[in-house]
Amino acid sequence: MVKIDEISRTSTFAWSQDCLPLLATGTVAGAVDVNFDSTSTLDLWDIFSPTNGGKPVFSASVDNRFYALAWSKPFEGRPKGLLAGAFENGVVEFWDAEVLIKSKDLNKASVHKGTKHSGPVKTLSFNPNQDHVLVTGGSNGEIFIWDTKKFTEPSVPGQAMTPMDEVTSVAWNNSVSHIFASAGNGGYTSIWDLKSKREVLHLSYNGPSGRANFSCVAWHPTQSTKLITASDNDGCPLILTWDLRNANAPEKIMEGHKKGVLSLDWCKHDPELLISSGKDNSTMLWNPIKGEKLGEYPTTANWAFHTKFAPAAPEIFATSSFDGKIIIQSLQDTSPPVSTKVASNDDNEFWNEISTTETQQPVFDVKQAPNWLKVPSSVSFGFGSKLVSVKKDSNGKSIVSIEKFVTNTGFQGSSNRLTDAFKSNDFNSIIDSKLEGKFVNKIDQSDWELLKKLHDTGKDKLFDEEVNGSEQPKVDGEKSEQKDEGANEAISSTEDSFFDKLGSNSGNGTSNTVSYIPQGDFKIFDSKQSEGDKKLIKLILNKNIDEAVSSCLEQDKLVEALILALDSSDAIKEKVRNSFFKKNDNELARVLYSASSNNVTDLVCHADVANWKEIAMSISSFCTDVNEYNSKMTELGDRIIDSKGTSDEKRNNAILCYLSGNALGKIASIWLRELPELEEELLQSKDTKISTPSDARYEALSNFVEKITTYRSISNISGEFEGPSIEPICKAILEYANLVAGYGQFDLAEKFLELLPSDFAGLKSERDRILKASGTTTIKQGTVHSRTASQRPTAINAGNAYGKPTNFAPSTGLGGFQSTPSNVVPPINPASMRLPQGHTQPPINQPHISAAPAANPYVKTASTNPYMPAHPSNSFSNPYKPATPSATHATNPLSPPPPGPPKASFKNQTEGWNDLPDTFKPKAAPRRAAASAVSPSPVPSSPQLATSAPKRTSVAPPLAPPPPKGVSRNQSKTSISTSNANSPRQSQAQMSSRYAPPPGVSTAPSTPGVNEAPPTVTSAPIPPPKNPYAPAMQAASPSLPKNPYAPPPSYGQPGILQPTIPTPNIASPSLGRATTAAPPKNPYAPPPGSAVSPKPHAAGIPAPRMGGVVAPPPPVASSTSSLPPPPGISQQPPAANAPPMATTVDQEPPKYPPGDRSHIPEQSLPIFNSLSSILDDIKPKIPERYAKHGVDMDKRINLLFDHLNNSDLLSDESIASLKEVCTALEARDFPTANALNIQIATNHSEETGNWHTGVKRLIQMSEAL
């Protein structure tokens, strides 16, 4: 509610019919003013005027007080309508509203006074269908019908069935003009028909609380048989709706008023809105169709006796009460809370403010928009040629429909052809369709014919027809080609004929040339010879060829010089060649120059472009390099464009050269310049599908992109547009993509957007718009690459502390074993294996070591350990999915581990730990392992390999229990491994034992008498151990902050160089006597080991993986390293080296708060959309007992989203891999998704953080559910 105005009058009122209505008020009869003033006034108020300052625009005193006022619609002769007043003395007076407003003279505006009533006139109403007809009612049951056009004697509607003492309310039917209703103190409502001049219906109601005394009546705005009545009886304050087709009982009974109802008004603009007021000082809003109360407005201090909507502004209504106020307010409540209005801290100011501030506000039980704010039906064009329409069904519910809207099917046909051509990479169909259709102009026709020829013949033969069919040019003064008449005439006495014959022989081949053999006697010197000839002969006979050639050139004997130069050095040849071209400057010599130098630059730059075909043929003949060929062809095209001649001919010849020279930018610039002209011709053509400039623009752009894509296809050009002049092309492509997307061709638009450079302006927004409109995301399908056995890393020497670590199988001091070959070896992150400076590894005795390749995550291998459980657990296996039993084979026996705590109590003490349960799958029956034989250890002092087994024959002291549930786990987050992402063995099948001590901290060799039998070894392949709760091993990295949630790398195993690095929660092992300040201790981590005599049970047993088992421990030597020393080197403790101090790296605070998803980059959006969709899909399906795991998974996935939103932690490679995981998940290819997730943990262990386990669980739960 917004309180618009408040008028200090104890008055009845009437609204004008204007959009910004005036309000007429008249002092109400029967009320006592607070000042005991007995005067009566008629006022006009402009409540929407900002200048009136709460004063009426007109006010005049009248002799008597009013019971009611009515303001008619404008009708003939009354442009502002008539204002009628019902006085307490029985007079009905009429005023012309327009005259009253303009003259402000009450007497001048008065048009009639009716005195037909014998007592007070209590009510009156104008007919909504016949604006000049008025009905009045008053005491003694009198009802009169007035014709305000003629003001003749009023008529009566007929005889009442049961006369009443007083008529208090009359109302006209809004649909049928001769029907009205009346109500009074008789307790009933009468329905009158003026045509039959009688009362036709009689409505009354007796309820459980008594008989209703109908005091007011109102008709349905549009339905002629429905009306509503209200009772002013305090014992039965009801509002009743009636349908006259069943007048025996009301349709709806609405209760809410605590005392009698005095006024009703049914909104003419919305049948679902009714306002009422009454003796309980309240004003209420109802939905009479549903019979429910919508809300209640602030109460008044006395009876609210009259309320009414403004006829032309139904959002506004007024309520008059006996407390001397008329409140004008709006239906909607937009006022601020009272607490914001009264905000003073001072007590005195508070009471002053609260006494002058409205502290009441309306209370709405049901929120309902009025009809004028509703849109019963709407329609809108959407991006992508979509038409969205909204309409209501019979129940009033909105129905939204989205339909395809195509205005021009001709355009759709061309876009479909383009789409098919892209899919098949065959644009020949487009060329054929263009050649078969009608061309706009000859230029366009020539382009497509040229593209057809280029498609059919290729660029190599593009000029054959032109050159072969043209006449060869002739040199001035030269006759036609001479025939070869024999060897003696091969060389003539003239230089020109010599070169002609030389060229002829070159052209015809030398196979028919007769070799010259000198015959007969001759003299070397002759008296007739000149001195120059004699000198030349001497030089030749002395084989002084250089001087001989120079002598020939001095004597202008060019032919002789050429003969001498044939078998001479390149310098001599070049000297003779230059001398020839300096003396000959004719056309043939220029051509010979280009041919002899194997360079057509002179021809391309200076030859007459009228012979452009011959120039093009020379380029094809002499330019073997592709780049040089394209450059010369483009240069020739430029010369043709700049030359004189017919414009169309030049253009076509230049395009031919550009097409041959791959000058796409040059071709496109010509086609783009011609677009406006083509659009004009299309508009002037008789093509039915071209009716607007936008149609012509689309058709011209379509023709352009078809030419471009066809040429690219013919020339085998793929990928994005490249080059310095691609901007105009890209703009045209982007515009065309926008247009075809507007026609709903999203796939075609995306194809064209892929041709644009990724950094092109406007590409990102256009692509986002198309993706949102199509409701799809583009995720490039990735392939999982694997390395074969031949690509495995080579084993390195254990003594090399900085060598590349390699996966090895565990080895014992007696010999090695062989593992099943694998097809996939996950890459290893050397950074995670590197030892820090200042903490070197001592020489290690390393017995026989055999490399064990990592297991292929896509191939299930059989176990070869007889003591391995029937269903060995893989660190990345799905605990929700039933496992496939593996075949077992008998091998050498192993010594069993010591017995642990009972299973049940162990489970209870570790309930609620971080790992996923294994209870979604049916439990498989365990297999009994083969019996084992115990063999003594040949080297009791050497470290042995501890393995898991179902039973243990030896007896050992009880091990420490897992941490209790009551202890907070926040202190040991870093000691709990949620995944073995950093381990170089993470893709191998894991053997585990529920009762084995943690790896890396197993007990030292026991003293005699403690164990019944020493441990034994086996040659069977044993997968590397893994303990999810073992202390974390992390490589020191000064550039990356430590993440307490990151999955720590597992401890080393024999045969692998492992650094000994202190972690934030693990005390560093002491080396010798050197001591360093250790980080805070982890209450659940094993205590630091002793280099001299480690205690057998120094470390407690961590909690097992829920639903899984704990991996067996690796051996621990008595030295500081867990690895045995290499052979030949005594096992002595090395010099103590202090471990490096922990490097602290301050983490930068995130750029955006957690939960914000508005800044996720475009390349990461597919990950967010895909994982969110999958997460929302499986969360409702998670059983209640695993709800905690679902919540943890959701939290971790959202942490991944936070990293994506802040563009931190994750590299581009990780994001690309995550996209592939999402693609596999959407395709329900869970093995591939799991393998890809493993690769992320392997290749980017420093980026996995605390989100990686969430993705792992999401894959597992998606597969199980």
Swiss-Prot record:
It is found in: Cytoplasmic vesicle, COPII-coated vesicle membrane; Endoplasmic reticulum membrane. Residues 462-490, 786-1163 are annotated as: Disordered. It is a peripheral membrane protein. One of its GO terms (biological process) is protein transport. One of its GO terms (molecular function) is structural molecule activity. Residues 473-486 have a biased composition (Basic and acidic residues). Residues 1080-1089 have a biased composition (Pro residues). Pfam families: WD40. One of its GO terms (cellular component) is endoplasmic reticulum exit site. Its main location: membrane. SMART domains: WD40. Residues 861-878, 968-993 have a biased composition (Polar residues). SUPFAM superfamilies: WD40 repeat-like. Keywords: Cytoplasmic vesicle, Endoplasmic reticulum, ER-Golgi transport, Membrane, Protein transport, Repeat, Transport, WD repeat. WD repeats lie at residues 5-46, 61-105, 116-156, 162-202, 209-252, 256-296, 299-339, 380-403. Residues 927-936, 1129-1142 have a biased composition (Low complexity). Belongs to the WD repeat SEC31 family. Component of the coat protein complex II (COPII) which promotes the formation of transport vesicles from the endoplasmic reticulum (ER). The coat has two main functions, the physical deformation of the endoplasmic reticulum membrane into vesicles and the selection of cargo molecules. The COPII coat is composed of at least 5 proteins: the SEC23/24 complex, the SEC13/31 complex, and the protein SAR1. SEC13 and SEC31 make a 2:2 tetramer that forms the edge element of the COPII outer coat. The tetramer self-assembles in multiple copies to form the complete polyhedral cage. Interacts (via WD 8) with SEC13. This is Protein transport protein SEC31. It comes from Debaryomyces hansenii (strain ATCC 36239 / CBS 767 / BCRC 21394 / JCM 1990 / NBRC 0083 / IGC 2968) (Yeast).
